[in-house]
C-alpha cells in the first residue's frame, strides 16, 4: 500500500487545510507514492519510537506532533530532531503528523478526551472560520453533577494522570465541562462564556490560573496526558477503513515531562 492511500483516510477525517498557520502537519519524511507495509502510531517521533519502529518492521510512523516545526539548517545529529529525521531517512521510515487539523476536526482530539471522561451532548467551544463543524475545544455535560475534586480524581484514574494543577474551586459541583487538549489557555474566556463549571486543558501559565476569577475551575492535566488519546483516535480512524494494512500502537511513546510526587 502506498503512503497516500493511508494519509488520504486520515485527511478525509481531518483535512490538512484545517491546521493552524504555524503548524506543519502532513507528510514530513517520505514520498506520497512510497510503498509501506506497517504503521506505528505515537504522540511524538523520538529515538525510542524509531527503535520500536525498526524492531517491529514499521516503515511509517504517524504521530500527533510534527517532529519538524521550523526549517532545519543542518543535519549533523546535534539535536534530537536532526538525529530522528536523519535516522528516519537512512532507515527509509516515513514520518507523517496530524496535529491541529486533528485537534479541530469534528470528533477529533477534544471530542475523544471528553468522551473518555463521560461528558456528553458535545458541541464545539470555538468554531473555526472554515465551518464544516470544525473548531477547537468542546463543551458538554456530565449525566449528573459531581463534586469538583472527585471529578478531578476520576480524571486522574481514567487518564493515568499523576498531577493536576488547578485554580481555585469555583463551585462545589461540576455538571458542565469544557475540554481542550494541548495548550488551551486561549480558550478560558470561551469556556467561561459557555457556562462551564470546569475547564480541562494543559500548558497553563501562572497568571492563567487567576483568569477564571472563580467563575469556573481550570484544571491543567498536562500536555502529553491530554493528547495521549491521539494514538487510539488515529488507530480507530485507520482501522475502520483499512482491513489489510497493519497498524501498531506504540508502547514506547512516553511523556518527556517527569514528576516528583
Language-model-detected regions and their locations in the chain:
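Active-site catalytic microenvironments in core metabolic enzymes, especially phosphate/sugar-handling
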Residues: 1-261
Amino acid at each position: 500500500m502506498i503512503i497516500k492511500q493511508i494519509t488520504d483516510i486520515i485527511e478525509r477525517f481531518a483535512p490538512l487545510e484545517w491546521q493552524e498557520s504555524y503548524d506543519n502537519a502532513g507528510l514530513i519524511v517520505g514520498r506520497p507514492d512510497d510503498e509501506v507495509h506497517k504503521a506505528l502510531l505515537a504522540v511524538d517521533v523520538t529515538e525510542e519510537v524509531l527503535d520500536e519502529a525498526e524492531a517491529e518492521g514499521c516503515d511509517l510512523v504517524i504521530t500527533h506532533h510534527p517532529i519538524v516545526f521550523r526549517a532545519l539548517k543542518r543535519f549533523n545529529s546535534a539535536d534530537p530532531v536532526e538525529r530522528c529525521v536523519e535516522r528516519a531517512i537512512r532507515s527509509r521510515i516515513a514520518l507523517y503528523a496530524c496535529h491541529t487539523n486533528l485537534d479541530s476536526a469534528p470528533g477529533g482530539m477534544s471530542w475523544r478526551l471528553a468522551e473518555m471522561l463521560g461528558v456528553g451532548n458535545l458541541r464545539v467551544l470555538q468554531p473555526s472560520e472554515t465551518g464544516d463543524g470544525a473548531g477547537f475545544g468542546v463543551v458538554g455535560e456530565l449525566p449528573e453533577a459531581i463534586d469538583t475534586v472527585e471529578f478531578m480524581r476520576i480524571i486522574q484514574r481514567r487518564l493515568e494522570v499523576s498531577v493536576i494543577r488547578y485554580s481555585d474551586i469555583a463551585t462545589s459541583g461540576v455538571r458542565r465541562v469544557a475540554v481542550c487538549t494541548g495548550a488551551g489557555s486561549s480558550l478560558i474566556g470561551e469556556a467561561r462564556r459557555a457556562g462551564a463549571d470546569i475547564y480541562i486543558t494543559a500548558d497553563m501559565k501562572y497568571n492563567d490560573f487567576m483568569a477564571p476569577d472563580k467563575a469556573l475551575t481550570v484544571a491543567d492535566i498536562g500536555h502529553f496526558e491530554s493528547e495521549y488519546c491521539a494514538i487510539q483516535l488515529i488507530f480507530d480512524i485507520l482501522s475502520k477503513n483499512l482491513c489489510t494494512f497493519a497498524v501498531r500502537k506504540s508502547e514506547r511513546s512516553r511523556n518527556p515531562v517527569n514528576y516528583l510526587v
